[in-house]
Amino acid sequence: MLSKRVIPCLDVRDGKLTKGIKFQGNVDIGDPVETARLYYEAGADELVFYDITASSEGRGIMLDVVDRVAREIFIPFSVGGGISTVEDMRAVLLAGAEKISVNSAAVKNPDIISLGAAAFGSQCVVVGMDVKHVGVSEQIPSGYEIVIHGGRKAMGLDALEWARTVEALGAGEICCNSIDADGAKTGYELTLTRMIAEAVTIPVIASGGAGNPDHMADAVTTGKASAALIASIVHYGEYSIKDCKDHMAKRGVKVRNIW
């Protein structure tokens, strides 16, 4: 059995670590490079960096931050935000990232997934899905809709259908983020996470809503995710990476420990 991964997520805006609730009310809370180093030393399995305004502002990638992070940590990390071409992907990987994450760009141009997978391998391509619960309809039979630009634009695209599509196009992993749960610390959207995880054969990362280690254990058991993405609970010092992994282990979840 593969170990379940604990992945801190660092949202970056203007070169600074930031955090909000449901993609709104973001406040700066620290230096992303220093925070990345601390999480690496604390036993994080991977890290995720999102430039949360690059896509909506139509600007490039935070390559300076990627380069500085790569010099400080020695675990896999992925980078998303502002990546819309194979050239963007190449630049991020050359700067030191192991994976690239595409979200809005993939919805607008799904070919970016297959082009990236062909150029760099599926293991490098993560598709981020921002998802909102809208109720079952003819257009959205699963009841979950894909949204982009931080949840501000609904796409009329069913989340379950999109997950199957991105796998077929060559994505190596899906990061499924619930806009409804994001930053609220009330738990992951387990129905959504399980639905996506059962529909595809590639790993699914649960994202949005972690408030305590129990929620993380729920995500990888009930939700069938391969990993739990976390932010607020570690950014604000409520729990350490060790706290999270120790509790998950007590729940019978296999995790990687460095202590």
Curated annotation (Swiss-Prot):
Keywords: Amino-acid biosynthesis, Cytoplasm, Histidine biosynthesis, Lyase
GO BP term, pick one: L-histidine biosynthetic process
A Pfam family it matches: His_biosynth
Substrates-to-products reaction catalysed: 5-[(5-phospho-1-deoxy-D-ribulos-1-ylimino)methylamino]-1-(5-phospho-beta-D-ribosyl)imidazole-4-carboxamide + L-glutamine = D-erythro-1-(imidazol-4-yl)glycerol 3-phosphate + 5-amino-1-(5-phospho-beta-D-ribosyl)imidazole-4-carboxamide + L-glutamate + H(+)
InterPro entries named among the record's database cross-references: Aldolase_TIM (IPR013785), His_biosynth (IPR006062), HisF (IPR004651), IGPS_HisA/HisF (IPR050064), RibuloseP-bd_barrel (IPR011060)
Superkingdom in the source lineage: Bacteria
EC number: 4.3.2.10
Gene3D superfamilies to which the protein is assigned, alphabetical: Aldolase class I (3.20.20.70)
Ribosomal protein among keywords: no
Family statement drawn from the similarity comment of this UniProt entry: Belongs to the HisA/HisF family.
NCBIfam families: hisF (TIGR00735)
Name of the protein: Imidazole glycerol phosphate synthase subunit HisF
